[in-house]
């Protein structure tokens, strides 16, 4: 387990939730004696939608909406058995998508 690396990718629409979750992960990993790199903020994806408001063919009346997907990356370089166990038990916010890969 000493030579492995755990890479955690987080995605969320709310930047406060993702920052809170990354701080919980980093705090848990450091408390168990692992080395942490990050959190690294990845580029935010902005998805824009334009909707016609008028029921007729009036192209001047439009509303625009956007969804921002915030992303963070955390690398745990030298995880211990305690680190893996603590991360498995960690309860994160429901609005955060977590992807974990071992490398």
UniProtKB/Swiss-Prot annotation:
SUPFAM superfamilies: Ribosomal protein S10
Classification via InterPro entries: Ribosomal_uS10 (IPR001848), Ribosomal_uS10_CS (IPR018268), Ribosomal_uS10_dom (IPR027486), Ribosomal_uS10_dom_sf (IPR036838)
Coiled-coil blocks: none
SMART domains reported in the protein's UniProt record: Ribosomal_S10 (SM01403)
GO biological process entries: translation
Keywords: Ribonucleoprotein, Ribosomal protein
Domain of life: Bacteria
Protein purpose: Involved in the binding of tRNA to the ribosomes.
Name under which the protein is recorded: Small ribosomal subunit protein uS10
Gene name, Swiss-Prot/TrEMBL: rpsJ
């Amino acid at each position: 387990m000493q030579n492995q690396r755990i890479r955690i990718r987080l995605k969320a629409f709310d930047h406060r939730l993702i920052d809170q979750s990354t701080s919980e992960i980093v705090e848990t990993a450091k408390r168990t004696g692992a080395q942490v790199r990050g959190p690294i903020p990845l580029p935010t994806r902005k998805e824009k939608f334009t909707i016609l408001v008028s029921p007729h063919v009036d192209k001047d009346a439009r509303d625009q909406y956007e969804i921002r997907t915030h992303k963070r990356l955390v690398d745990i370089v030298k995880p211990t058995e305690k680190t893996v166990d603590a991360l498995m038990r960690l309860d994160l916010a429901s609005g955060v998508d977590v992807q974990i890969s071992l490398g």
